[in-house]
Structures are given as structure tokens and as C-alpha cells.
Amino acid sequence: IRDPEMSRGLGDVYKRQDSYRYTARRDDNGLGVCPDCDSTHEHTPYEEAGTNEKGVMVSATESLYGTDAVLSVDPYVDNGIEEAEITTVLLSEASTAREGVALLTSIYDNAGAAGGSGVFIADQNETWFVENLTGHTYLALKLSSSVVFMQPNIAAMGKIDLDDTDNVVASANLISVAQKAGTFVGDAAANVIDLDASYNGDIASDRMAAGLNYLYGTDTFTKDNYSETDFAISNVGENGAIVPVYSNIQLTKKFSVEDSIHFFQTEPIGKTGNVETHLFQVSATGDLNTAITEWTAFDDDVYNAFVPYYPMLTTDTADVYKVSVHKVTRSDEQPTEGVWYQDAKGRYYTYPDDWTDSFYGVRDALSNLLTYGSNGNQVTAKDRAAAKASYAALQQEIMADYADMKAAVAAADTLESKQAAATNASNAMSQKVYNTTLKMYNKLQAKTAARAWVSSLLH
């Protein structure tokens, strides 16, 4: 349980009356050193996403960046709330999604933001999406049940009528900051702003193009040929009237959880830069304890399997998540010993001996092996295809395990037995992903070394 008073030692204190228990993924914080920045300052490690005891969900944030013009008018605030703190603050203090929106926007109003981001705040009844791109401006939308959009570090909000007060919460200065910056696009008299056009700037993104191709079921989009109308969300209809929030993305079918997982596996949405991926599956009806399923994956989603959790019932995580390992060593010169790889920028990274003892470590090691090779030895396209096939088969096993978990939880007759059934099942699935990944890594590492040895004999 988080203390309702939270301070980063920078003079800013967020204080509320209540504090709630929550389940969240976070980085290891061994010896009091934050692994995100390697410092000992007082903020918590990045709690990527999670759910609290009231059923409030907060997604991981997606970093956003306002243009130089708007930031010159309303710059980020050094002591403002940062992305690494949003999940911690909201989950410990909000009892509904709407309370979470009110809390976050009040912090933006009063303390400001240290950077821009987009974040989902949801409960069983409502889902809100909040974007901020400068120090004190923000726009929050209550989403309709059918809206589809994505946000690969690009503001997703297009033309928004701020008079839709049931579904829109906006900072009082949202239009005026853009006007002062000379970037405003919209109709100030009608209280309408195009947030993306006014604040965001460049929208070219290979990930956006890949996502549009996947969602539209086509292959025609590139980062150079799509426009805001292809992806942005809006509440302004063709005649200028306020309508439920929509986007122009029309899915070719009703998406399942597996379809959503495949979205994250689409390159370059899936890549070695992935750290954690969270997919919240929420039912608007039924027992809150089982209405929310959080699917999680670590590292590169191209080669991965997602594990389901009932966050309201989870009381522990698999032991393999709790392993603290030594640091990876980075160098500019090729290492002479150990297991290492060279990334696309020419930097060398050497693993500690215990790296694959942890869930994240072994996932990271296999991802880098498939992407960059190992000790100068490269894998083949056949190796990569085999890894994808292995994870696809594993995902099907996990889907079957998830069905068994749901049945076991439904059959349990006490809260404690439901918690045990859910926790044990999710931990077993996590262990299965770890075991499969370690086996794949060791086998492929040996194969690349053998190929290198044969090649040296031939030459």
C-alpha cells in the first residue's frame, strides 16, 4: 500500500486522503538504486502499468513531445510529475477512472509536467485517454466503446470540440497556448482545437504506418503517405456537430485478444526496444475480480508470448521475476571475453554470467541474439522464423492454460482459493515462457557458435 503522501525530494508533494492497494509491474530496485536512471533519488522505479483494488487501471505512458514553438510558451517543469510516477500516484489514490483523470489533470494544473505523454485511465465502466504535450496543457477524452486508434509517440487526438463537457476535460489554456505559439489549428470561437496539428508537429512514423496496415488489413501505408485523418480520434462530425469519439480506422473484423497480440508483434511496433507490453481486456459486466485480465509480455514482441493475469486476484509473481542480476557492460571496443553483441549503432554489450537467470534477462538475451547475433556470429532468417513459430505454439498453449485458469477460479468457492488459483496459474505460465525462452536461447547460442567454428575451419 502506497503512502498517500508522495515526494520526490524536489519540493513537490502529492497528498490525498485515501490510499489503495494495487498490482503493478515495476523495475527491480535492488540496493535502493533506480534501474531506470542508475541514481539514488527518491522517486519510485517506473511502475509501467497496473490495476488497484478498486478496479482502476492505468496503462504505461507513451512519451509525447510538443513542438519547440508551444514549449517556448509553456515549457516542461523540472519538478513536475514525470511518466515514471503517473501509475504510482493514480493507482494509489484513485477509486474510479474519473477520479484518476481529475487527479492527474489537477497535478498538471498545479505542479506541471516534466514531459509529455499519453496514458489510459480506465475502470469497468469508463475508459479515458489523456494527452499532454507541454508543461500545463492537457486534453482528456472519455472513449466510446468502438473507437480504434494508436499512439506511437504521436499525439492521437485530432479535431476536438471542448464543449462536449460530458466526455472532454481540457486545460483552460489549451487553445491560448497554441495561439501564442502561432501554431493553433481549429476554430477558437467554436471552442474546437486540432490537438495533433496544434501541438505535435511531425507525424511521420514507420510504426504508425505498420499499425495502419495491420488495422486496415492492407500494405499500402508508408510513413510518407498517411495523414492525420487516417489515424486521429475526434468528436466532431462532418456537419460540425459533437458526436461520440471516433477514428476513421475501420477494422475488417471484430478483434480478439490474439489479434491484439499480433498487432504488438508487427514490426517495427515489435522490436528490441520493447521493454514491457500490457494489454488490458475488460468486461463491462460481471464480477470485478474476473472482469479485468491483464496480458503482459517482456522485451521484443516480435518473438514473444503474452501471459494473462487477473490483477484483482494476483497475490504474488513467479520467482523468476524476482531474480536480481548483475549489470550488462557497455563498451566502444570489441570485448575479448564473455558473451556479447554489437547493436545497430556499433556499441558493444557484454552480459554478466547470471543474466539468463532472470525472466527479463533471458528474454533480452534471446531478442538480441535473434536481432544482432552473438560474439560477431549472426543467426539466419530460418532461425528467426523458427523462433516465431515456437512462440506462436507457446501462445496457443497459454490460451489453453488461460481457459483452465478461468475455470479453476470460477470453481473456487472462497476469495482466498480464487486468489490461489489465479496466482498459481499465471505464475506457472510465466515459468513456462521462461523455460521455453531459456531452452531456445541456449540451443541457438550453441548453433551459432558451431557455425562459426565450422566456418573458421573452412577458411
Task: Give the location of each predicted region.
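Active-site-proximal beta-strand/loop segments in catalytic clefts of secreted hydrolases
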Residues: 60-64, 124, 297-300
